[in-house]
Amino acid sequence: MPVTLAKTISKIQFIPNNTNAQLVKEMYEYLKSNGVSERHQHNALKVMIPFANYLGPTTTFFDIKSKEQILAFLDTKKKNEEEDTEKKWITTWNSYLVRIKYFFRWLYNQRGKNADAIPWTEWQTPSFVQIKYKKTKRLSPYSETEIWDRDELLTIVKY
């Protein structure tokens, strides 16, 4: 049975650092008040709660000042070649990075401000979160002849 948003929200109270727990709650409230889908809210919480737990009781999100601190957490998502021959962990790693970047962009640009203060498209990404995504080297399951080019797509989709 899949975990519900309500169940994930209930896990916020178990974050070992009260400051981090409060920040995760505030981010959730921000997402909810801006009409973000429940799935997006849930996915954001599913990343930030484990990240807060990883930081432990003595480190707050405000203490994060280097890429290495974030990379150490992200690298816990890596799997060895035997466990994941297709390197699907890279997709998870990148997904976690997207959500962590969003959180820190919210924290440093929007938290505690009027909802209309700065549009999210103009938020600045803190330098310590400017981490490049990993590229997968998985081979495509499609042959060269099975991939459509632009002209073929336009015959089906007329816009």
Locate predicted features:
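Generic alpha-helical segment signature
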Residues: 17-21, 44, 66-67, 146-149
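Amphipathic alpha-helical repeat elements characteristic of tetratricopeptide repeat
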Residues: 21-25, 71, 150, 154
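Long, amphipathic, Lys/Arg-enriched alpha-helical "connector/arm" segment
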Residues: 130-159
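N-terminal core-binding DNA-recognition domain of tyrosine recombinases/integrases
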Residues: 8, 25-141
